[in-house]
């Protein structure tokens, strides 16, 4: 039987509706949640992401400002802007759109964001809190994956979870979040000896490696939950995930499509984190 679709668009719309209600409640208490997005340079994909974030904020009633800086902006100038935003009482969340130009040290910039405004969840202190299980902002994409599981009624407790990819943005944090929910977690990467054998063990398989259609149906356990974080452009117009959707959907119990799976969840979680920051 073909897999059930984990519809990220539908679930993200539910999350956004919850956020909109929470924003109204906060405004009634005199708190107006605010997000600042910083974009350096002209990267076309980044421009689209930033536009989408700004529009999503408007839809739920979050105040949003976008700071567009030229690609030649110095690191010192960028750090000065972040310092100003850290001190700005109307801004509760700060997001620096990655990637940054090569001459800017990404790590230094992320470190400069005040912990209580780090709604992307990337700062070392935030990541440390995630690892030890303290209160933190969950990084948006991993959090989106967990909410997809939750809304589908899938409890990771006692299940074997395999995460393909070990990036700081998705692979590592989603592994930690699954661990916190009592899954048994394996992280696979480019040096994993037998990726197919590892994937076949998974009750929950999360693919976040950035390789088009790397994971095929024969690598998937019957009835597994497959969450595809990858978004890869093939040719001029086609977008595909890290999972070969057609073959995987014949084996999986649940699967996310690409596009329309994890992507919409990422922005919904950013809105959720911004409201959480305002509430704190």
Swiss-Prot record:
Pathway participation: One-carbon metabolism; tetrahydrofolate interconversion
UniProt: NADP(+) binding residues: 165-167, 190, 231
Alphabetically ordered keywords of this record: Amino-acid biosynthesis, Histidine biosynthesis, Hydrolase, Methionine biosynthesis, Multifunctional enzyme, NADP, One-carbon metabolism, Oxidoreductase, Purine biosynthesis
PROSITE patterns documented for this protein: THF_DHG_CYH_1 (PS00766), THF_DHG_CYH_2 (PS00767)
GO biological process: L-histidine biosynthetic process; methionine biosynthetic process; purine nucleotide biosynthetic process; tetrahydrofolate interconversion
One of the record's GO cellular component terms: cytosol
Superkingdom: Bacteria
Reactions this protein catalyses: (6R)-5,10-methylene-5,6,7,8-tetrahydrofolate + NADP(+) = (6R)-5,10-methenyltetrahydrofolate + NADPH; (6R)-5,10-methenyltetrahydrofolate + H2O = (6R)-10-formyltetrahydrofolate + H(+)
EC number: 1.5.1.5, 3.5.4.9
Keyword Cell wall biogenesis/degradation: no
Key word Zinc-finger present: no
GO molecular function: methenyltetrahydrofolate cyclohydrolase activity; methylenetetrahydrofolate dehydrogenase (NADP+) activity
Subunit structure: Homodimer.
Record HAMAP family: THF_DHG_CYH
Function: Catalyzes the oxidation of 5,10-methylenetetrahydrofolate to 5,10-methenyltetrahydrofolate and then the hydrolysis of 5,10-methenyltetrahydrofolate to 10-formyltetrahydrofolate.
Record-stated family: Belongs to the tetrahydrofolate dehydrogenase/cyclohydrolase family.
PANTHER family reported in the protein's UniProt record: C-1-TETRAHYDROFOLATE SYNTHASE, CYTOPLASMIC, C-1-TETRAHYDROFOLATE SYNTHASE, CYTOPLASMIC-RELATED
Protein name, per record: Bifunctional protein FolD
């Amino acid at each position: 039987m073909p897999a059930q679709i984990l519809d990220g668009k539908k679930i993200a719309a539910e999350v956004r509706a919850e956020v909109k209600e929470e924003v109204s409640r906060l405004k009634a208490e005199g708190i107006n949640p605010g997000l600042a997005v910083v974009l350096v340079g002209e990267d076309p994909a980044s421009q689209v992401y930033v536009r989408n974030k700004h529009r999503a904020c408007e839809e739920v009633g979050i105040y949003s400002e976008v700071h567009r800086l030229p690609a030649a902006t110095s690191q010192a100038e960028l750090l000065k802007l972040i310092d100003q935003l850290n001190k700005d009482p109307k801004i509760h969340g700060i997001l620096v759109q990655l990637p940054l130009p090569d001459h800017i040290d990404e790590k230094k910039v992320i470190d400069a964001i005040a912990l209580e405004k780090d709604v992307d969840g990337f700062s070392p202190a935030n990541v440390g809190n995630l690892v030890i299980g303290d209160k933190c902002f969950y990084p948006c994409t991993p959090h989106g994956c967990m909410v997809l599981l939750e809304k589908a009624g899938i409890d990771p407790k006692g299940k074997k979870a395999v995460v393909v990819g070990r990036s700081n943005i998705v692979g590592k944090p989603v592994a930690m979040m699954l661990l916190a929910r009592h899954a048994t977690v394996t992280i696979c990467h480019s040096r994993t000896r037998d990726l197919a054998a590892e994937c076949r063990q998974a009750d929950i398989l999360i693919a976040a490696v950035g390789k088009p259609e790397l994971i095929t149906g024969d690598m998937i356990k019957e009835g597994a939950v497959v969450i595809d974080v990858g978004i890869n452009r093939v040719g001029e117009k086609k977008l595909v995930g890290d999972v070969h959707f057609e073959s995987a959907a014949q084996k999986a119990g649940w699967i996310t499509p690409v596009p329309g799976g994890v992507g919409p969840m990422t922005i919904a979680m950013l809105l959720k984190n911004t409201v959480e920051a305002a509430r704190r």
